[in-house]
């Protein structure tokens, strides 16, 4: 409610990761984390705040800080379903309107794909959208993080993310990096590497989300 009072309508929270080592998690148990994140999400809904479930499909098993380096989480898909993705699945399947975002992290989940999650069609389109049923806005974590920049240039990472099913590309700090990501996507559309239909679908999801919040 305080965020709404001072004029904010978006918050990149809550953190749904289970037991991440640097203190941003609600806890080390999926049910416990689910309970607290559901309460947080209902509070954001009541205040009309657009929020973001992060960092899909869960970073609790990571042993590094993705701001600085890449890491491969080797848990199987079955383990991810039984543990890390439970809080995400709880919100996605139990909230009537999917008028929130899911933020996808940059780590690699070998049980799902060999690519970082934020540029993986397997993680985003197949797992998050088709299997878990999320049809709302997908946003990347900050694309300037070392986990992604260690593998991709800025002009190519945005294109790869949109191809994977991302709607919003988050580049937080450097204007030159923002321009490189933008120009990469623009050039990809001009050369038909990306379709205008994909861009239009993302725009529709974003506008629909805003309208739902305005009407709540």
Where does each model-flagged region fall?
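Active-site-adjacent structural elements in enzyme catalytic domains
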Residues: 1-7, 204
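Short, conserved phosphate-binding/catalytic loop or strand-edge motifs used
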Residues: 13-21
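Core structural elements
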Residues: 205-213
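Short glycine-centered helix-capping/turn motifs at secondary-structure transition points
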Residues: 192, 213-214
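Second-shell residues forming the walls of enzyme active-site clefts
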Residues: 28, 32-198, 208
């Amino acid at each position: 409610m305080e965020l709404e009072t001072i004029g904010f309508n978006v918050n990149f929270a809550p953190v749904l990761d289970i037991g991440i080592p640097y203190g941003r998690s609600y806890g080390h148990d999926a049910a416990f984390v689910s309970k607290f994140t559901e309460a947080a999400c209902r509070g954001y809904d009541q205040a009309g705040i657009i929020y973001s479930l992060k960092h899909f499909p869960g970073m609790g098993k990571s042993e590094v800080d993705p701001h600085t380096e890449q890491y491969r989480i080797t848990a199987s898909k079955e383990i991810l379903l039984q543990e890390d993705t439970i809080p995400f699945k709880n919100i996605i399947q139990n909230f009537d309107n999917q008028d929130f975002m899911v933020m996808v992290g940059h780590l690699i989940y070998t049980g799902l794909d060999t690519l970082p999650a934020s540029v993986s069609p397997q993680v985003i389109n197949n797992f998050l959208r088709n299997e878990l049923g999320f049809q709302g806005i997908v946003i990347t974590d900050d694309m300037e993080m070392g986990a992604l920049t260690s593998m991709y240039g800025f002009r190519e990472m945005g294109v790869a993310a949109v191809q994977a099913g991302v709607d919003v590309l988050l580049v937080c700090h450097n204007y030159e990096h923002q321009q490189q990501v933008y120009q990469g996507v623009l050039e990809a559309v001009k050369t038909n590497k990306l379709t205008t239909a994909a861009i239009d679908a993302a725009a529709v999801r974003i506008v629909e989300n805003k309208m739902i919040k305005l009407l709540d």
